[in-house]
Amino acid sequence: MLADMCVGVYKAAMNYEIRPHEFSFNTQESLFTGLGLGFLAATAVVASPSLLDLPITAAEVVRIAMRAGILLYQKSQDLEQLSLDSSLESWTTVVRGLDESIVRGELEKFNKSMETPPSSRIYISVVEPDGSVFISGPPSGLREFFNKSGKVQSAPRAPLPVYGGPCHAAHLYDRTHTEWVVSKVNPEIASRRLSGHPLVLSMGDGQPLAGENARDLFESATYVLLTSIIRWDSVLAAVKKLPHWKQDTKLQLETFRPSSPAVHGLISAVQSEYPDCTVSVDDLGDWIIDNSLEPPTIPIDSRIAVVGMSCRLPGGSDDLQRFWELLEDGRDVHQKVPGNRYDVESHTDMTGRRLNTSHTPFGCFIDSPGLFDASFFDMSPREAGQTDPTHRLALLTAYEALEYSGYVPNRTRSTTRDRVGTVYGQCSDDYREANAGQNIDMYFIPGNYRAFAPGRISYFFKFSGPSFNCDTACSASLAAVQIACSALIRGEADMVVAGGLNILTGSDSFAGLSRGFFLSKTGNCKVFDDGADGYCRADGIGSIVLKRLSDAQQDNDNILGVILGTATNHSSHAISITHPHAPTQEHLYRSVLSQAGIGPHDVDLVEMHGTGTQAGDAAEIESVTRVFSPPVPRRSHPLYISSVKANLGHGEAAAGITALMKALLIFQHNAIPRHVGIKTALNSKFPDLERLNVHIPKETIPWPYRSNRKRYVMINNFSAAGGNTSLLLEEPPVRPDPQGPPQTRFVVALSAKSTTSLRRNLESLITWLEGNRSARLASLAYTTTARRMHHKHRIAVHGASVAEIIQALHQRGSRAELGLLVSKPPSVAFIFSGQGSFYAGVGSQLFKEYPPYREQLQRLDEICQQNGFGSILPAITDTDADVSQLSALVTQLTTVCVQIALCRLWRTLGVKPAVVIGASLGEYAALYAAGALSASDAIFLVGQRTLLMQKLCTANSYGMLAVQGSVDDIRRCVQDRTYEVACINAPRSITICASIKDIVDIQQSLVSQGYRSVKLNVPFAFHSSQMDPILDRYEEIAKAVSFRSLQIPLISSTLADAAVQSRSLVASLFLRENTRAPARFAEAVAKAQDMGLVNSHTVWVEIGVHSTYSGAVRATVADLQAIVPSLRSDETNWHTLAVSMCTLQETGVPLDWNEWYRPFEPEVRLLDLPSYRWDLKNHWIQYNGDWLLVKDKRPRTDQISAATPSLRTALVHQIMEESFRPDGGEIVVQSDVMDKEFFAVASGHKMSGRPLVSVFSYPDIAFTLARYMYSRLKPESPLPAMDFGQVRVLQGLLPRKDRSKPQWVRMRMRADPQCAALQLSISGLSDESSRHVEEKLASGVVRCGDRQSWQDEWADYAHLLTTRIVTLQQMAENGQASRVSRDLVYTLFKNIVDYADHYRGIQSAVLHGLEAVADVILAPSNDSRWTAPPHHIDPITHVGGLVLNAGHATDHHNTIYVMEGWKSMRFAEELVAGELYRSYVKMNPARDGSGFFVGDVYVMREDHIVGKVRGMTLRPLPRILMNRFFDPPDDGDGLATQHIQPHDLPQVQHQPSPTTDSGPDDDPKDPNTGPLTPEVDLPVAPSVEKANTKLVRGALALLAAETGVEPDGLTDETEVSALGIDSLLSLVLVEKFATELQVNIQSSFFLESPTIRELKEYLTASW
């Protein structure tokens, strides 16, 4: 019906638009009426003085119709709830062939015999001229009526499609409803005078509607619609009696349904009375199929609001505040290309002679582009590392921009996920070409191709709107904004996340732009400078959130700026494609200004494209001055011009979005920052800017808001490909200060996806609040609850002031468990309590100050009054009332109505119960909540029952006593008094009934024996024999009501059981039992637990006037998670709800905070709070070497040369590849572990009886390769001393048991031209499908040094070392330290490592705590093919292992210590066999508390230090795991290594990264000296005891290795989805499980296992 009415009004408007001359009506010649909602449509035309007024009047009438529909729906739900899954049932049936009087008599008889509640009566709603009668009422009542009324039952009848609820019902509606429906009409329309307007005849009695203005007309029409029986014959009679008629009157009917009986009846009636009257009928319905009318093509409002933004920009501008500070400080942040991009020295040649080099070493760069929170975005570290950092930072900034905008999915129409799009500009993808392309892996395509950048955002946030990646070169991001605006204006989306992306990692674009003469060789963009010599490339990531302005205002968003227009054109007439063209730019500006309706002189600031090129700056200044500041007419206000590129460089695809964000910050800070691009003098090609009133700000210029002049900024963003994009930005609209809602206590919520981020979020909010103590608490609460996305780790606090919130947050921060973890939303149970705790003014504060609750109670109060029970509102509003003077009828009805209203409130707030339970009187509200009873039925039953009590029972003759004791306790204590058990709430919470005299004696007896008891303030003893007189009569009354199907399970305290279906329950019998039988609450809850309806994780919400059942539930449900009250008598309503909502928020119950704040949203604001604090780790594939320079010029060595290699030692075998160039060199060597000499090295060093290659073999490899490369790169220079440091041991190298096939190890060393640092990586090779796969074993760096300087340094403290050694030896002599012989040393060692004889160099040792000194004599070598023999390096240094694995300072019985690595190893002279050396060490626990030990080993010959191993690190390993770690594979071609892991790293790096912390001797400038990230394959300590199997450990190790997640992160509660296992990675894991674990599983297994715990349990149970 509503749709018909809307169409009707619209059709009328369109019809008269075509024929405007016909829109002329007056009292003498025009007459209107209508049926149903069509009656309201008629009032829209009558209330419109002219055709121009009709659209806005029609819109108001549509709103009236909507509110009327809402009222009908509410009434239908009160009378008979409609469940979501139930079919629609008609509220009206037409009966033909019976006189109205007969039907009315049958209705009266039925309603009386059935004792139908007054509000549920069946009634007549329409009487047609042919005698047909429309009978209306609740569908269940209609069915019952037609089944029992013989006369009507036999008459022809048909249900009508009336599903909206009861209408034309005077017993249900009155003038208050009419006033509510019309109350929101626009005052300008409502006050419109209607003198001389045409008549509107009532469809009830045919009388003209009275009223002096439009509001009166609307109210009268609505009242007729709601209350009057439609009698069309009365309308016809009234029409015939009008004084307008003459014999030859012409009647013109305009109708939408000319064939309807009503129209035919009208024509027949008129022509029978006036035969000469001619009738013409205009069928306005033809318009429906008329396609000649085209919809308007110009939108009413094309203004676009920017509501959120975020950035990652150079110069440390990782957020908007730092960006503004950079602008305000006037910083120029250009720098040399950092080492994490490429080696700037080797890839730059300012002469341009060297192939593929850049001419400039400069750029502007984001500090740490690899930082990313992979787990937040459900990405594995493996996928994150292979994903372009532009994509990752797009995700981060998109989230921050959405957070800034207050985005919550589906909160409003404009935030519906299906209507949100993403558009990003991007013109390069260096990471794909230079970084990820070095080792192409499974995520190469989705991780690097441009389309995936916006697509990944849409996928993560589940946006279904349009997603575009836009490339227009340098103007890509502003072009993306234009696309976004167009999508919004055209209605293709309601919100768009847009931005620009640029991260520079490769040298190719630098080289290409250099050779195209785009780039400056001297530094940053010198915008407007006379010496401008090109632009400076820059990183840039920016994201903004866009909405239509009207939507943003409706959503209560913070509007940062308004885009009035944007356009793009192309410089097709330029002299070349890359050359700018001023006339084309000029045309573009005028187009944008015209689009916005703004004059050029209204614009006071132009944010220029300003690349700092001679051609670009000159063309742009020409076009700008011609349009915005021509000589004539001269501007009256200054025009300021500037460019952000002077600060941050040219961000290329991100340039436009950077300029836009700058302009938005200018509005925020009311100032224009100074321009820093002029380094020498103003460009001499510029016109006289002073004369044109054009100014370049040389200092920060205040630019405040003015009420009489709006601020506009034109933003230019031009493309090297010839495109020009401009955007006109208007300052945000001014909003009045909010007054704030009436609440006195508010909830502030925090959440995160990890505990690390949660703590950081907490700390940042505390810091912000301490600096903003004047912040509005209501807005703070609104921002953190209604305008935030909530994650699984949660904190919620409440307070009445900001100071209270700060204190509460500090208290939470001091807890060991910071917040609650919500793995999934818990189930919710509603408890409806009884009536024993009633008090005056129950819920009065909520009623007075929270409109939705008040409206619910007012609706319920109407039902009370319609049933003749009177109003309950005085008992709520009068807080000083004497409860003892209130009747039982009032208290019981108030209790039930409050419970129903609270139930509706909680449901509106998103708290949906999975099960409900009622106690005593509360069972009525529980039946309502479960769907068995309507609100009207519940109120009717409670009211009738209470009236019977008041009539048939004597008030206050019986009493009820709540006892803290068991039934047996009471029986034992009370033996001489008669009582009945009324309620068993918990095993030791019993309510009994007795006569007043006995109840007093019983209470005294219980108290005397130590039992607490409370007499309930109730006039009757429910569930006792006092109820017997009312039972039969109440059962009869209750037969008028039938239970409907339960929508949710009901735990019945009457039945002490859980009802899932209500079909077996007879309402009258059940309600009789509820009145008389004891309420067995505890048994019911226990039964619900047995049935699985509730458990310890269920959150209980008590709905009643006070919290009375929390103790009972806790006594019955073990380990109860939470129970919260709705109201309490001892605290304010706001306090109770705040505490309860805190608990619900923390436990994960979905709360619709937006709905909570909806009534007061205009009075709160979205605050600019600190953004989400990420748990960042560095995911970065470092570009290594020079392949971008040499490309295919490098010599290939695909086949192993047959010639004798030029390098061969025991450990270094075949040269696979070598290249030596002016910019450095690289060598790749391959060795066979199964080679006799190599295997002998491993055999001399066994762990768990298995050969293991000593890590002290690696110095020999490192020094051998380093000397070889040095001699090749610097053949004329003598070999220097060398230091092998930054060694990280990633895996142990164990020879396979099967020695029949080779086991390859590959060594790769890279060197810079000066050989200052030679980087070594050692990897094992496995053969997977004939494809060699490398797994890194160790890494380190050889540095060249000066032997003499080392000796000079050591000489300064050699005497101190000697003194300490002497002291230790004296302590050994005195028994204060332990002296250990050679045999005992290696006997002790044998528990861990079994050394061959030539490794056993220690002759004796002295141990004291973590300190030791050893005498060492090195064994001779059998041949000379060693550079640093392992059997020399190992014994000279393994004194550190002796201290930890054999001394008394550590628990070496349960723990062993294995080598992790060292920072530096240097020897000032060669070690000589047979010489006596002395090794000293003191190990110290690592400062980070990891259990690692670190120490320096000093090697002395006589009194001189000849060597030092600095920072030698050993890690602990449980001794029980030795066999697992050092048990090599039996066969196969796979890599025969077992993973031994170092401690957790602060970052995840996928190649050497300069962000790794360096030691004091490390060269921080070298980009290739960072440690390599270990593969992760540690055993994870089991937390599920039954899952501690080899299979589970292997599975977890595989998961860790393939996802890149740290093993410690694989806890039982870890969600598999958070590991980033997608469909692609799941296929890899399936293959790995099959080949390595011999377990065959489906790929969906990883996508369907929620947590690691379930994964473990599945594996344990299945295998």
Swiss-Prot record:
CDD domains: PKS. Residues 19-168 are annotated as: N-terminal acylcarrier protein transacylase domain (SAT). Residues 830-1149 are annotated as: Malonyl-CoA:ACP transacylase (MAT) domain. Binds 1 phosphopantetheine covalently. It is an enzyme of class 2 (transferase). Its EC number is 2.3.1.-. The keyword ATP-binding does not apply. Multidomain protein; including a starter unit:ACP transacylase (SAT) that selects the starter unit; a ketosynthase (KS) that catalyzes repeated decarboxylative condensation to elongate the polyketide backbone; a malonyl-CoA:ACP transacylase (MAT) that selects and transfers the extender unit malonyl-CoA; a product template (PT) domain that controls the immediate cyclization regioselectivity of the reactive polyketide backbone; and an acyl-carrier protein (ACP) that serves as the tether of the growing and completed polyketide via its phosphopantetheinyl arm. SUPFAM superfamilies: ACP-like, FabD/lysophospholipase-like, Probable ACP-binding domain of malonyl-CoA ACP transacylase, Thiolase-like. This is Kotanin synthase. Keywords: Acyltransferase, Phosphopantetheine, Phosphoprotein, Transferase. Its cofactor is pantetheine 4'-phosphate. Disruption phenotype: Leads to complete loss in coumarin biosynthesis. The lineage of its organism: Eukaryota, Fungi, Dikarya, Ascomycota, Pezizomycotina. The active site is at C474, H609, H650, H1245, D1434. Residues 1209-1527 are annotated as: Product template (PT) domain. Residues 1544-1580 are annotated as: Disordered. Residues 1586-1663 form the Carrier domain. It comes from the Eukaryota.
